[in-house]
């Protein structure tokens, strides 16, 4: 049984699209729909299962209860629906475990997940506060610890926390989640992400990712495993994992982003263009796709395209550190060294990752400053430092003994 990720399923929320069209876009055989009504004397929940091939109504049921314990009602309904789906498919349904018995903790957790999925620095910080409040109500709430771990990793990528701060907090929270619930696959995945990005211990991390996936971890874990495989030069395995991630979450551009880097490490330009097109198809105005289009264009000396995309980012996302980075890259592509240096100075003022500064210096052929910034990236345990073995931006300085020493330092040689 394959269930698509939340982000892809929620892409259709409230849009009233035909179930057959949804089935085609998500590549699923059936769609489960539901509604919730609070009435004066209780609660009514209606669920229906429709076949996507022809819209045929497979099953429906209404659940009515006067119980005030919403968590108990949720567990009962979830187990009932799971059993019915398994009856239609054939086979026994696994019992669905209630993550907490404390209604206040559960409500705070749901608020935290809402903030988490808004994907902004401020909302992610708010999510951490809400998850911590949930834990205060129920210290055994493993999923709330998982929420903290995932949020801390995102805050590192958003440059709101240093790698040292964020990854250590993420590991601590994920380890607590695993201690409370050893079968929580995504918690093992967060351990893998934090440990690989910070400790560079591939053998241990590989086991953690594989454990996570064996327990049914979601798309972010599979993406992270695919990314880690790419940094080790295991490109075929990386592509396989990232394509599975795309099947799990077909409406998200994130798997295509990670596969772009895999193609980039392979110097496969056609593959990179394909991933750019896929990101644009899914979210035409997604800044991640636009920034990577600059990366590809600069590497291919397509400076006019790089300038156009960088200017778009500058207009729409001027405060994003990545925007200043691509503006510097585009200036370097055009041969405008003073402008590139000005943008690099702005990147530093905004607290951009040292790895991005190193790319800027490499593009203006400043070998010493590029290697100096790469050393700072390694000192800070930035996740991007694991790109150095295959990153095309550094081909010009790859043979420098100082560069080779950095590869050895982070465990890539």
List the predicted regions and their residue ranges.
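Glycine-centered helix-boundary capping/hinge motifs
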Residues: 25-27, 365, 411
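Short, ordered coil/turn segments that flank beta-strands lining enzyme active or ligand-binding pockets
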Residues: 52-54, 363, 401
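Right-handed beta-helix
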Residues: 379, 383-391
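Helix-coil-helix junctions within alpha-helical repeat/solenoid scaffolds
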Residues: 284-289, 294-375
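Short arginine-rich
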Residues: 354, 382-384, 413
């Amino acid at each position: 049984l394959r269930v698509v990720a939340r982000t892809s399923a929620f892409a259709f929320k409230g849009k009233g699209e035909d179930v057959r069209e949804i089935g085609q876009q998500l590549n699923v055989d059936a769609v489960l729909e539901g509604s919730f009504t609070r009435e004066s004397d209780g609660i009514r929940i209606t669920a229906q299962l429709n076949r996507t091939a022809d819209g045929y109504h497979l099953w429906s049921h209404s659940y009515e209860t006067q119980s005030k314990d919403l968590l108990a009602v949720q567990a009962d309904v979830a187990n009932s629906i799971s059993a019915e789906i398994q009856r239609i498919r054939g086979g026994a349904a696994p019992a669905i475990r209630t993550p907490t018995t404390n209604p206040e903790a559960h409500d705070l957790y749901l608020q935290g997940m809402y903030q988490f999925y808004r994907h902004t620095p401020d909302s992610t910080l708010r999510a951490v506060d809400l998850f911590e409040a949930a834990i205060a109500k129920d210290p055994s709430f493993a999923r709330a610890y998982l929420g903290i771990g995932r949020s801390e990793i995102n805050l590192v990528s958003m440059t709101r926390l240093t790698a040292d701060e964020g990854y250590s907090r993420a590991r601590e929270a994920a380890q607590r989640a695993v201690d409370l619930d050893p079968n929580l696959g995504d918690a093992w995945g967060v351990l893998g992400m934090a440990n690989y990005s910070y400790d560079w211990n591939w053998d241990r991390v590989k086991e953690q990712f594989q454990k996570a996936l064996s327990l049914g971890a979601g798309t972010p874990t599979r993406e992270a495993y695919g990314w880690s495989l790419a940094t080790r030069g295991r490109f075929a395995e990386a592509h396989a994992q990232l394509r599975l991630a795309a099947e799990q979450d077909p409406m998200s551009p994130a798997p295509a982003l990670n596969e772009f880097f895999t193609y980039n490490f392979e110097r496969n330009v056609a593959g990179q263009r394909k991933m750019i097109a896929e990101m644009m198809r899914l979210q035409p105005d997604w800044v991640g796709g636009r920034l990577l289009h600059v990366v590809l264009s600069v590497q291919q000396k397509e400076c006019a395209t790089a300038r156009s995309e960088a200017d778009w980012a500058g207009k729409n996302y001027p405060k994003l550190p990545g925007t200043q980075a691509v503006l510097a890259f585009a200036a370097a592509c055009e041969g405008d060294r003073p402008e590139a240096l000005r943008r690099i100075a702005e990147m530093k003022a905004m607290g951009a990752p040292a790895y991005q500064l190193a790319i800027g210096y490499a593009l203006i052929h400043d070998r010493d400053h590029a290697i100096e910034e790469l050393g700072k990236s390694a000192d800070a345990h930035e996740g991007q430092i694991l790109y150095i073995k295959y990153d095309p931006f550094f081909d010009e300085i790859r043979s420098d003994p100082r560069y080779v020493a950095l590869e050895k330092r982070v465990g890539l040689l």
